[in-house]
C-alpha cells in the first residue's frame, strides 16, 4: 500500500500474456473484517473468465482482513471502509504504474461487503476506476444487522463517524459519473443486505443527477441462487466487456 503496509495479493494474467502490451485490469475483492481471499486454493468465478478475454484480474486482501494477526485485523475497528478503500485504491494506482497495464482501463468489483467497497472506491477514486460493479452492497452501516456491525464497528453512539463517514449513501456527491461506469445489482428478497440499501443509494444518486446502471432481481436472495446465479454472472461479464 502507499503507506508502506505489506499486503497480500494474487494476479491472473492471460495465457498469451505479452509484457510489451497494455492490458485492462479488474480488481476483485471482498475486504471484510477477518476475511481472506488471497490463499492457496482454487475457486473460479465469473471474473476469472475475463482472463480468457485478455484481462488481468487482481485480488488484494487489505488491512482489516484475516490471517495476519489480531492487530492487523482490528485496524479497521470502528471505521469500516476507510483503510480498506485506501488499500484498494493504492492497489489500483500500483497497477496503473505497471508498463503492461492500460491505466485508463482499471475496474473494481465486489459482492456484499465487496459491493460496499466497490462503491466506496468508485466514489473516492476520483475517476481512477473506469468501471465499478457493486452486488448486494451495504450502503449504510445503519441499515445492516447489529450483531455484525456492532462487532466490527462498535456502537453507533460511540463511533458515529465510523457509521456515516464511509457509508456510500453519504458519498454520492463524490461520484464522477462522467468517467466511471457504475452497475449496482441487488435481489429484492435479500435477507442479509436488505434491498433498502440499494434503494437509498439510488435515491442519493438520483437526487444529485448522477447516471449509473442497475439490475434488480425480483424475489432473489443474497446469493441469487439458484434461479439467477447464471444470469447475474453473464450480466456482469457482458457489462465488463462493454465498459472496461
What function would you assign to each model-found segment?
Residues 1-244:
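Serine-hydrolase catalytic core recognition
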Amino acid at each position: 500500500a502507499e503507506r508502506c503496509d505489506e499486503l497480500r495479493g494474487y494476479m491472473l494474467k492471460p495465457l498469451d500474456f505479452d509484457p510489451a502490451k497494455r492490458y485492462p485490469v479488474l480488481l476483485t475483492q471482498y475486504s471484510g473484517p477477518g476475511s481472506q481471499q488471497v490463499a492457496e486454493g482454487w475457486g473460479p468465478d465469473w471474473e476469472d473468465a475475463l482472463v480468457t478475454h485478455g484481462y488481468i484480474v487482481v485480488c488484494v486482501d487489505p488491512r482489516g482482513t484475516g490471517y495476519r494477526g489480531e492487530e492487523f485485523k482490528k485496524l479497521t475497528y470502528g471505521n469500516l471502509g476507510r483503510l480498506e478503500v485506501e488499500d484498494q485504491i493504492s492497489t489500483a494506482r500500483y497497477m496503473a504504474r505497471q508498463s503492461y497495464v492500460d491505466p485508463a482501463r482499471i475496474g473494481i468489483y465486489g459482492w456484499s461487503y465487496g459491493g460496499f467497497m466497490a462503491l466506496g472506491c468508485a466514489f473516492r477514486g476520483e475517476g481512477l476506476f473506469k468501471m465499478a460493479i457493486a452486488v448486494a452492497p451495504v450502503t449504510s452501516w445503519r441499515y445492516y444487522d447489529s450483531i455484525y456491525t456492532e462487532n466490527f464497528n462498535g456502537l453507533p453512539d460511540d463511533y458515529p463517524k465510523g457509521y456515516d463517514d464511509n457509508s456510500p449513501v453519504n458519498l454520492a456527491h463524490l461520484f464522477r459519473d462522467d468517467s466511471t461506469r457504475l452497475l449496482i445489482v441487488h435481489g429484492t428478497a435479500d435477507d442479509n443486505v436488505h434491498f433498502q440499501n440499494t434503494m437509498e443509494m439510488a435515491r442519493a444518486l438520483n437526487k444529485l443527477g448522477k447516471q449509473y446502471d442497475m439490475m434488480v432481481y425480483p424475489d432473489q436472495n443474497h446469493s441469487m441462487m439458484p434461479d439467477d446465479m447464471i444470469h447475474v454472472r453473464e450480466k456482469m461479464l457482458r457489462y465488463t466487456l462493454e465498459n472496461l
